[in-house]
Curated annotation (Swiss-Prot):
Chief place of localization: cytoplasm
Catalysed reactions, semicolon-separated: N(2)-acetyl-L-ornithine + L-glutamate = N-acetyl-L-glutamate + L-ornithine; L-glutamate + acetyl-CoA = N-acetyl-L-glutamate + CoA + H(+)
Keyword Acetylation: no
Swiss-Prot/TrEMBL GO biological process terms: L-arginine biosynthetic process; ornithine biosynthetic process
Gene Ontology cellular component list: cytoplasm
Pathway assigned to this chain's UniProt record: Amino-acid biosynthesis; L-arginine biosynthesis; L-ornithine and N-acetyl-L-glutamate from L-glutamate and N(2)-acetyl-L-ornithine (cyclic): step 1/1; Amino-acid biosynthesis; L-arginine biosynthesis; N(2)-acetyl-L-ornithine from L-glutamate: step 1/4
EC number: 2.3.1.35, 2.3.1.1
Protein name, UniProt field: Arginine biosynthesis bifunctional protein ArgJ
GO molecular function annotation: glutamate N-acetyltransferase activity; L-glutamate N-acetyltransferase activity
Entry's transmembrane regions: none
Length: 393
């Protein structure tokens, strides 16, 4: 996939197991507008803290990413290692150190193997242009089972452009952000301040609307770079083509977010949870996330048990305003609850049939207002426990 003005590279630096790409570089030939969102965990990894400082400038040349080590909870050394990594890249691409961002993912509490990173960076930079975005997606994987890539094309002022994104993440996935990294590149010319706003809006309905296990990581980062190489008139609030760009960006991020859930550790189901008729959108999101994060609900999904009571209970303890005798609950189009009680008839059998599917929807209508939210989740299987019990061994 070609995105004008961007080059990619990935190498094996022996950070992960032998034979796996684990050091990647995304580089723009010219300074690019940049926006980013980060984990809300109060325990933030060194690369997150460094990037938070640097993205305030609104411009960026490159992002270097390692997988296999999170560089989190590593003290002063962790920050020194993050800075050195960006410095080594910057001097080889002819950029300021402050124009280079760094991301890490992997085991927490272990210092970066800097001798391996130092050894890998010369070939990483020399190989710019030799890798595809698919290979970068593979290089940033940890417990993922497949690389995640999505792209869209659009036009602005009669000029075509591309938006392409990659992501990783399969566990510790819950808003806001989670063990997930996402990188979006576009050759569209975009005003930096508007890019920041539109990127945050798109994140709210995508990466901040997914959960696999309710855990929040120390490293989560989503970055977008827009280098203007397409040559379109600069996109900004209300400009021609701005609305289309915003829609396409949201489509890319939502598709990546769904792929993360589908690749959830041990996941066998993909479930869309919608709460509507709430007092507010915030109430709806609160209730939907309570359902999507409930271990009892998720194990019922895995067991294909139409246990609507667990869902109803999760809505009740979510903190959202609920009047039980008004509520309805559906599995796909099968009404399981009406007026706060079991719908009766053949609902149990039909609901069980829905839960046998790989993908289905759960809809709760509170009948209290116009608030609405949708989140995406998976089931919780035996394999999730095994994957995470064995993670460091």
């Amino acid at each position: 996939m070609n995105v004008k003005g961007f080059r990619f590279s990935a190498v094996e630096a022996a950070i992960k197991k032998p034979g796996r790409l684990d050091l990647a570089l995304i580089c723009s030939d010219a300074p690019a507008a940049v926006a980013a969102v980060y984990t809300t965990n109060k325990v933030k990894a060194a690369p997150v803290l460094l990037d938070m400082e640097r993205t305030t400038s609104g411009t960026c040349r490159a992002v270097v990413v390692n997988s296999g080590n999170a560089n989190a909870c590593t003290g002063d050394r962790g920050m020194e290692d993050a800075r050195e990594t960006t410095s080594l890249v910057a001097e080889r691409i002819g950029a300021s150190e402050h124009e280079v961002l760094v991301c890490s993912t992997g085991v927490i509490g272990v210092p970066l193997p800097m001798e391996r990173i130092r050894g890998g960076i010369p070939s990483l930079v020399a190989g710019l242009g030799s890798a595809t975005l698919d290979q970068i997606a593979a290089a940033i994987m940890t417990t993922d089972t497949f690389p995640k890539l999505e792209a869209r094309t659009g036009t602005a002022g009669g000029v075509g452009y591309t938006i392409a994104g990659i992501a990783k993440g399969a566990g510790m996935i819950m808003p806001n952000m989670a063990t997930m990294l996402a990188f979006v590149v576009t050759d569209a010319a975009v005003d930096p301040q508007w890019l920041d706003r539109v990127f945050r809006r798109a994140n709210d309905t995508s990466f901040n609307a997914i959960t696999v296990d309710g855990d929040m990581s120390t490293n989560d980062t989503a970055i977008i770079m827009a280098n203007g190489a397409a040559g379109n008139p600069v996109l900004s609030e209300g400009s021609e083509g701005a609305a289309e760009f915003a829609v396409l960006l949201e489509e890319v991020l939502l598709s990546l977010a769904k792929l993360i859930v589908k690749d959830g550790e041990g996941a066998t189901k993909f479930v869309e949870v919608t709460v509507k008729g709430a007092r507010s959108d915030a109430d709806a999101k609160r209730a939907a996330m309570a359902v999507a994060n409930s271990c009892l609900v998720k194990t019922a999904f895995f067991g294909q048990d139409a246990n609507w009571g667990r869902i109803f209970a999760a809505v009740g303890y979510s903190g959202a305003d609920v009047e039980p005798d008004r509520a309805e609950l559906f599995f796909d189009d099968v009404r399981m609850v009406q007026g706060g009680v079991f719908a009766g008839g053949d609902a149990e059998a039909r609901g069980t049939g829905v839960l046998r599917k790989k993908e289905f929807t759960v809809t709760v209508d509170l009948h209290l207002g116009d608030g609405r939210a949708t989140v995406y989740t998976s089931d919780l299987s035996y394999d999730y426990v095994k994957i995470n019990a064995d993670y460091r061994t």
